[in-house]
């Protein structure tokens, strides 16, 4: 199965009714997203060996919240949705959609917000980004979207991605239309922008018990059935790993068919779990999975592979 976004005027009345039964997509709810993430990162930093880095990530998430309200985005995506729907492509495809200079405006605003909070190497990094040319910034963005991580240092990548993510999340929040599940391929990528997930979550509330993958760029969540590999869609050789016990709120789902794993967060076991924060705070589980020979099928926006990884 794949997910395609259909313009409102192309949906029949029956589709408009059934589209809400099991929502294929959950668009980002930006009002509380960054504040909730920052709070969760700070909470997880307590008694965590990665505490300093989690607090650093919390500063970026808080800055995203501030910049979101200071620099709103106005854009009519109706034509883009129609074109993408006709082509069967993600409407905000990172490999196709031209980048507006708005994202660089967001980056400069993030840097201005973060500067008073930074010191040492981190301050040097954002000052270096502040001095970079427009083309240099575009080249780094293109490299990240192409997974050419050797071209962007791992200390610059989180800041570049934070601005790109904010821009794409703003666009995703403006999408007019409904999502429809169809047969297709590449379900492991975000149907809105084509980026990778950061983790998956089994939710509570109106989507009780359903698993959604969380996009590491546009913050959209898309439905993928449980007990099926989110990377290759096979189901015969899945294993579940945790550092605590079978009732752990964070597990890794590994697949022996493709040799990858993705974390699953369970809201029913810990309602506070957050897709980015809890993934970042559980790197010990990633180390265990690497020891077992599995490759991660996702990327955390605060932790990019370095050169040679």
From Swiss-Prot:
Write down the InterPro entries for this protein, in alphabetical order. FdhE-like_sf, FdhE_C, FdhE_central, FdhE_N, Formate_DH_accessory
Sorted alphabetically, which keywords does the UniProt record give?
Answer: Cytoplasm
Task: Please explain the role this protein plays, according to its UniProt record.
Answer: Necessary for formate dehydrogenase activity.
Q: What is its main location?
A: cytoplasm
Which PANTHER family does the UniProt record give?
A: PROTEIN FDHE
Q: Which SUPFAM superfamilies match?
A: FdhE-like
Single GO term (MF): ferric iron binding
TM annotation in the entry: none
Q: Which GO terms describe its biological process?
A: protein maturation
Q: What is this protein called?
A: Protein FdhE homolog
Where does this protein come from, organism-wise?
Shigella flexneri
For this chain, the family text in UniProt reads: Belongs to the FdhE family.
Keyword check for Cytoplasm, yes or no. yes
The superkingdom of the source organism is Bacteria
Q: Name the GO cellular-component terms.
A: cytosol
Q: Where in the cell is it found?
A: Cytoplasm
């Amino acid at each position: 199965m794949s997910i395609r976004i259909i313009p409102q005027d192309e949906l029949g009345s029956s589709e408009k009714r059934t589209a809400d039964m099991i929502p294929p997509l959950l668009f980002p709810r930006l009002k509380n997203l960054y504040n909730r993430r920052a709070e969760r990162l700070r909470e997880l930093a307590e008694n965590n060996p990665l505490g300093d880095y989690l607090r650093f990530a919390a500063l970026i998430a808080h800055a995203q919240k501030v910049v979101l309200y200071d620099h709103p985005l106005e854009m009519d995506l109706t034509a883009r949705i129609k074109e993408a729907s006709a082509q069967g492509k993600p409407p905000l495809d990172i490999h196709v959609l031209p980048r507006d200079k708005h994202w660089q405006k967001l980056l400069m605003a993030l840097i201005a917000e973060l500067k008073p909070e930074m010191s040492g190497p981190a301050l040097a990094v954002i000052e270096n980004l502040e001095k970079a040319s427009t083309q240099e910034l575009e080249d780094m963005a293109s490299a990240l979207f192409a997974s050419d991580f050797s071209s962007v240092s791992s200390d610059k990548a989180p800041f570049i991605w934070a601005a790109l993510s904010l821009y794409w999340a703003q666009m995703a929040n403006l999408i007019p239309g409904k999502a429809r599940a169809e047969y297709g391929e590449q379900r492991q990528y975000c149907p809105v922008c084509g980026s990778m997930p950061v983790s998956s979550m089994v939710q509570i509330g109106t989507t009780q018990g359903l698993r959604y993958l969380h996009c590491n760029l546009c913050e959209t969540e898309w439905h993928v059935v449980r007990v099926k590999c989110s990377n290759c869609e096979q189901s015969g050789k899945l294993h579940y790993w945790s550092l605590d016990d079978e009732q752990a709120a964070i597990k890794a789902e590994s697949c022996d068919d493709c040799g990858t794993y993705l974390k699953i967060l369970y809201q029913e076991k810990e309602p506070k779990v957050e897709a980015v924060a809890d993934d970042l705070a559980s790197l010990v589980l990633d180390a265990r999975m690497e020891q077992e020979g599995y490759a991660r099928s996702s990327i955390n926006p605060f932790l990019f592979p370095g050169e040679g990884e």
